[in-house]
Amino acid sequence: MKNNIRFDLSDYLIHFFRDVDLETGSHIYLPEHCGFNNQHHACFIDAKYLLRLSLRSHKIFSSWSYRNGQRTVYGDSPVVCFTDMPIAAYLETGVRRLERNENIGLYAIVLPKEQMFNYGARPVIYGLDEHNNARCSQGRYGERILDETALPLIEQYRYVTYVPGKIDWTHEREWRWPYRGDINNFLNHIKEYGIPENIESTPGFDFRSSEISGAGIIVPFAEDIPTVAHDILTLIDRGVIGRNTFKFIIAVESLQSWT
């Protein structure tokens, strides 16, 4: 559509990786062993490692976005989070927020928005009707469940609190993809041992089993390109993904301008 050709719109969804400290309340769940040549030996895990782990595992891992030890994603489905900011806008805000030591990263996987919509990704819902009550109950594994008269359970993964002047995440232009598979064994293993059993049982969007094409990678440095390209080519040689799954790699430092 001609009306969609605008500088503030994008045909892509961006999932970025940030540095993570496993000993904080904003952690992620990773198994002790993530497969051959994918070992992390410290509680601090850098964004480049997480990008390469996702590529080598052909999976973007789902989570409930823990903050201070509490889930921030409502409902019972873990999600993969994206922004639909145009790539140029993401690069600009990413550089500025990193300068302020905010939680963002310049390592990212870029997926075509229309294809991801067909796989179930949806824009989040910022706030509810003023007559609906957003109070929630807590489930066995820490789920935050809203009253279904306010929002059906199947849609609750999309809800993001919005209180003008106090809580405003609308600048993130967030989309989410919900994992709809069975997660009981995953949750039980975490409850008993504190970590997932293995990388295969960790929920996420598996681009091996999808027909995604035209995806891309963003890295901050040109020196990152050979290693990331190696990971992608290895997947192609193994027959895990197709030749057209990934089409580009952007190194931020090589761009003369993104405005």
Regions found by a protein language model. Give the residues of each.
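NAD-dependent ADP-ribosyltransferases
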Residues: 1-259
